[in-house]
């Protein structure tokens, strides 16, 4: 999980989710794309 100031989709498999006021990018196929904002 990378922590970034701005999160973007890196592929079509990425899903953007809001949990507890934070924005996450989650990818089940390629877990290297997982990111969290802030």
UniProtKB/Swiss-Prot annotation:
One of its GO terms (biological process) is translation. It comes from the Bacteria. GO terms for molecular function: structural constituent of ribosome. Keywords: Ribonucleoprotein, Ribosomal protein. SUPFAM superfamilies: Ribosomal protein L36 (SSF57840). GO terms for cellular component: ribonucleoprotein complex; ribosome. It holds the Pfam family Ribosomal_L36. NCBIfam families: rpmJ_bact. Belongs to the bacterial ribosomal protein bL36 family. This is Large ribosomal subunit protein bL36. It comes from Aster yellows witches'-broom phytoplasma (strain AYWB). The gene is rpmJ.
């Amino acid at each position: 999980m990378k922590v970034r100031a701005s999160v973007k989709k890196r592929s079509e498999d990425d899903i953007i989710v809001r949990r507890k006021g934070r924005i996450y990018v989650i990818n089940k196929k390629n877990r290297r794309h997982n990111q969290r904002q802030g």
